[in-house]
């Protein structure tokens, strides 16, 4: 399956000032497969090592940080084949299980800069925090992976012609039915299936929703098992409680995350470490409030007032026990969660683009689902789950802060209008992957 992260790997390989690459991302989002495939296609030799269960591997790093010795022992002893600097890609998988291997990346950067070495881990954020691991600041390149984006999903499911065709259309042009009908269907399927590669592969192989759900159930169980595997029993219980509360909290009108809704009477102090664990693991995504939208938004964010989404919209749908037919056919009673799924979908697409969003809210409850300062510009994004695009909050925001460009994303077709100083675009949910194209057009980047 085609992943855009592959291009990032190629760019890393060809950099003149290349450093060891540290690939992070939620468990089962496709890191190991992609890195191995990259090695198979781009290198004469691949030396793969996995710290999760490969006996004796950690001891190679326990003695000292002599990189020549480490490479010699990894090659000659562990795998029984010499590692050649100019030809071999060295992969250190599940590196979070070996703190000294993470530290060794600094010395590989300094002593053997020509060696192609990729380290990957699913719980890197958790390990770095809980084990007090000294991170090799400035000595590694970073790549964060996510589940498959909508664009990647469509291409994997045989819809490349629709993606390619849409990319050729003028941005101002209303999208013809030739594209809208199949892409709306792909969008609904993406809400059901999500972007976890194993689930997507099951869907591609069978086009059976129940088969895909069986894979989703296994992943959800694996996540829950990780809570107890990598934390104390007390913390695992708290993480599980937060994990179970996320779909409930997302579905509320005011989807601000409230700790007392996790456990009656609970305070933030009691549960914030458990929340940090689930966010650092990549399983959940945290969206902070910005009340005063000034650039940089990161400096204006209130990390104590936030929403929590999941890193995969298909897993959210499955965990919330929403029948796939409800997504595909619709239901008059399916209202609040339908909007929550659309928001979670846009959040994931923005993250896949490398964009960090926030949300905006006033004391009078006017709210913008997402705002970002991508490219140094303030950009509000309002999300609607159907084709009703009335957006009072967006008009209020544009009138008050005068962003040069703003977006309404729904099932309504492409359209635009000028409101004061703001150019407001209607961008269909299934065409949101063109978000950056509209930015480039607006600002002539």
Residue ranges and their predicted role:
Residues 1-16:
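Pre-Walker A adenine-sensing motif
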Residues 31:
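Conserved lysine of the Walker
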Residues 34, 38:
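Hydrophobic positions on the alpha1 helix immediately C-terminal to the Walker A/P-loop
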Residues 91, 116-122, 144:
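Structural recognition of the conserved hydrophobic beta-strand(s) that form the central parallel beta-sheet
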Residues 201-372:
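Accessory nucleic acid-recognition modules appended to NTPase machines
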Residues 346, 350, 368-387, 406:
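Conserved catalytic cores of phosphodiester-cleaving nucleases, focusing on short active-site segments
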